[in-house]
């Protein structure tokens, strides 16, 4: 039987996000918080210029509100997941805000962004090292690896990788939202099965909020999540998986994040080494756009792939 608390968390976050959307989106319009579109991107995206951004605030606020309604006194692990969610989201918010002020797709400098991300991930790494332990589970092998002191650089690299991967995935209407609904649902189920109830409520509250946000973010998007949303989502899924000692499971359930990131790495490496590009455009979702796929088709196919790999991940546990 499904725990009523889990159902209530999904329902409440969905309702709260559904209420916040029609409040926040017009406010973003009024403040002229419109998205600047990269000229080197797909030409079909130029018409999206001016679409409100920083919409990630909708599901961030909805998740926080739901957490404190459903869990009066969250556990330390739920609070640290919330901190990761909000901390990375705040860095994204600053980046988005500067892009709007400068009226171009350049916010924080790479150095500024790196310092802020290091501050957030540094605290999370310290917490993980001290309270979670340095062992992680290995999918399919039913065993663990103890990283010892190497755990610290591993986790720092891990946070950088996951947050940037989710950020890269947020390039089509509804793509990062749809994929992450599935990822957080998976993590919520695993958290619940392992007895991490507060953490499970956080995951499903986020999933419910994302489902509501999808109403505004699906093609044609009425609002973009911005770096505010994508970095927050990356921070959330990375921290939850780490708490569960399952960071490597993200390679499976976050297969789309992985593919998106690899496509960029391969594209850059190929062009620098040979002067030729592997894909028509990177990240890979733009490659499929150039092949004539609609945004809706790409999102649907990538979501189906995520579902398949979530089942594979279940089998690996």
UniProtKB/Swiss-Prot annotation:
Catalytic activity field: UDP-N-acetyl-alpha-D-muramoyl-L-alanyl-gamma-D-glutamyl-meso-2,6-diaminopimeloyl-D-alanyl-D-alanine + di-trans,octa-cis-undecaprenyl phosphate = di-trans,octa-cis-undecaprenyl diphospho-N-acetyl-alpha-D-muramoyl-L-alanyl-D-glutamyl-meso-2,6-diaminopimeloyl-D-alanyl-D-alanine + UMP
EC number: 2.7.8.13
Top class in the EC scheme: transferase
Function noted in UniProt: Catalyzes the initial step of the lipid cycle reactions in the biosynthesis of the cell wall peptidoglycan: transfers peptidoglycan precursor phospho-MurNAc-pentapeptide from UDP-MurNAc-pentapeptide onto the lipid carrier undecaprenyl phosphate, yielding undecaprenyl-pyrophosphoryl-MurNAc-pentapeptide, known as lipid I.
PANTHER family noted in UniProt: PHOSPHO-N-ACETYLMURAMOYL-PENTAPEPTIDE-TRANSFERASE, PHOSPHO-N-ACETYLMURAMOYL-PENTAPEPTIDE-TRANSFERASE HOMOLOG
Protein name: Phospho-N-acetylmuramoyl-pentapeptide-transferase
Subcellular location per the Swiss-Prot or TrEMBL entry: Cell membrane
Cofactor: Mg(2+)
Pathway annotation: Cell wall biogenesis; peptidoglycan biosynthesis
A GO MF term: phospho-N-acetylmuramoyl-pentapeptide-transferase activity
Provenance organism: Clostridium perfringens (strain 13 / Type A)
Gene: mraY
């Amino acid at each position: 039987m499904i725990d009523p608390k889990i159902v209530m968390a999904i329902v409440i976050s969905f309702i709260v996000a559904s209420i916040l959307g029609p409040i926040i989106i017009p406010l973003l319009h009024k403040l002229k918080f419109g998205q600047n579109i990269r000229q080197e991107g797909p030409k079909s995206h130029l018409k999206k210029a001016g679409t409100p951004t920083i919409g990630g605030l909708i599901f961030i606020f909805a998740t926080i509100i739901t957490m404190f309604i459903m869990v009066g006194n969250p556990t330390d692990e739920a609070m640290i997941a919330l901190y990761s969610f909000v901390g990375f989201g705040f860095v994204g918010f600053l980046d988005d805000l500067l892009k709007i002020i400068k009226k171009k797709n350049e916010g924080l400098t790479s150095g500024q962004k790196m310092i802020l991300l290091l501050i957030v991930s540094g605290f999370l790494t310290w917490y993980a090292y001290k309270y979670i332990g340095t062992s992680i589970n290995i999918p399919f092998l039913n065993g663990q690896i103890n990283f010892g002191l190497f755990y610290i650089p591993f986790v720092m690299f891990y946070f950088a990788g996951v947050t940037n991967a989710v950020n890269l995935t947020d390039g089509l209407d509804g793509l990062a939202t749809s994929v992450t609904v599935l990822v957080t649902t998976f993590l919520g189920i695993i958290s619940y099965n392992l007895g991490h109830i507060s953490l499970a409520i956080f995951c499903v509250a986020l999933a419910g909020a994302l489902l509501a946000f999808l109403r505004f973010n699906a093609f044609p998007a009425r609002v973009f999540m911005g770096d505010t949303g994508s970095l927050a989502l990356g921070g959330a899924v990375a921290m939850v998986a780490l708490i569960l000692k399952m960071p490597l499971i993200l390679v499976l359930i976050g297969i789309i994040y992985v593919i998106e990131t690899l496509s960029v790495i391969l594209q850059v490496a190929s062009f620098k080494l040979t002067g030729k590009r592997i894909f028509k455009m990177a990240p890979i979702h733009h490659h499929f756009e150039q092949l004539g796929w609609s945004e809706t088709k790409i999102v649907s196919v990538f979501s189906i792939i995520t579902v398949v790999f979530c089942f594979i991940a279940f089998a690996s546990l």
